[in-house]
Design a protein with these regions (language model features):
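Signature of short aromatic-glycine-proline-rich micro-motifs recurring in repeat-based ectodomains
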Residues: 19-23, 42-73, 97-101
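Short, conserved, GDST-rich strand-edge loop motifs in beta-rich repeat architectures
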Residues: 1-16, 68-96
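Beta-propeller blade signature
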Residues: 20-29, 86-108
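Surface-exposed loop and turn segments in beta-propeller and other repeat-based domains
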Residues: 32-49, 107-111
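Beta-propeller domains
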Residues: 2-42
Length: 111
């Protein structure tokens, strides 16, 4: 068989993901960056595998932007598959609970 200096983990973890900070870039129609707004990680974060967050929604009056995120610290594992507090699923392999959150950002950047 020989020797190998590599290490492999073949155990599948379908709920794995890690949270990270959220940054909103404002760009012109030609693609030039205007500015970047960092969403405070003390409020919310995003999670790598989730497909239900960060869909940007503009209000009908064009004055606010909303999106869904997680009320969890950055660099936390398995948040997007965690239970919601007070709604526990005993079949969920993730043992933690985190709230989902809706973030509203005003045109001036206020959160």
């Amino acid at each position: 068989m020989g020797s190998s200096s590599n290490v492999f983990n073949n155990k599948v973890d379908g709920s794995f993901g890690i949270t990270s900070p959220i940054f909103l870039d404002q760009i012109t129609p030609s693609g030039t960056l205007v500015n970047t707004l960092a969403i405070p990680t003390g409020l919310v974060t995003t999670s790598f595998p989730s497909k239900s967050e960060l869909a940007l929604n503009v209000s009908t009056d064009g004055k606010t932007l909303t999106f869904m995120a997680y009320a969890a610290p950055a660099n936390t594992l398995d948040v997007s598959n965690s239970n919601t507090p007070a709604v526990y699923d005993p079949t969920n392999p993730v043992g933690t609970s985190y709230f989902r959150a809706v973030v509203q950002v005003a045109a001036n950047g206020a959160i």
